From Swiss-Prot:
Protein name as catalogued: 4-hydroxythreonine-4-phosphate dehydrogenase
Annotated gene: pdxA
Source species taxonomy: Bacteria, Pseudomonadati, Pseudomonadota, Gammaproteobacteria, Enterobacterales
N-terminal signal peptide: none
Binding site for substrate: H136, T137, K274, N283, R292
Pathway: Cofactor biosynthesis; pyridoxine 5'-phosphate biosynthesis; pyridoxine 5'-phosphate from D-erythrose 4-phosphate: step 4/5
CC cofactor: Zn(2+); Mg(2+); Co(2+)
Amino acid sequence: MNKISRIIITPGEPAGIGFDLVVLISQKIWRSELVICCDPDILVKRAKDHGIKLKLHFYNKNLSPKVREKGELTIIPIKVNSNVTRGILNINNSYYVINTLTRACLGCINKEFSALVTGPVHKGIIKDSGIKFIGHTEFLAGFSLCKNPVMMLMYNSLRIALATNHIPIKDISKCINFNLIRKKLIVIFNSLRNIFKINNPCIYVCGLNPHAGESGHIGTEEINIIQPAISSLKYLPCKIIGPISADSIFQQKYLKDADAILAMYHDQGLPMIKYIGFRKSVNITLGLPFIRTSVDHGTALNIKNLNEISSKSMEKAISLAIDISQDNSIKK
């Protein structure tokens, strides 16, 4: 029997649907103790909005982890700085969001928690407050001193990783270099073996330019950077194939063999997974010293009808975090 683990969850932007997702997932009995790092008053209010009775237990690290009953959650209370109105951003609560992430990250680093699951944040409002914030991936990597984080979204057996994350299109070609591609591929390889238990993985790599550069006629990054980086990893017990044009790589003839695909930038890789698995896929950060999964969607500030809120992505993110933390094999 697997030992019960503790999973810490940050709901994210308080004006968004993160708190609603937590309320909805409380209606299941999980295999781990879920610890929610948030403002308890907002959580209780959202539960009332949904007509759900919620019982909160204050977190005590000296007690053994315990699976909670339906409608019960463990909580680490962190208060918001200002009033919260559903759907309306409040710049004063940006530090609250960072405070919850900081507490959760510290707890994972010191092994207090087995994994972190994050709800959606609003990057813009955090930046507007003066905080240097690019995204969850970059924040968690910086906080944990991880030099080579890899953002990956996955839906069933489709896993799409990114060479670059949240940067403007005009800057992407400047960021793509031999060491970057090589290091990202090594992190992906190690994660496929250690997390997903795939001993001899197959990784496909997208080109940067249309038609993967067309033999250097539409850009030379494929010839000068991507191919040499792939060739330098021939010693690894895996297949790394590419660069392949991004308009071809998502054909079934490639996908059927791919354990992961490395896209060069955010909007090259993620439209495919958002198309086939939106609200049912999971974001996972590879390379961190702890497990971190997340929902595949944003804050959904414009949702008025509570019945439109789906917790499927959050449920999948939690299930994946539990599977990994309890060292279950996650098979293709």
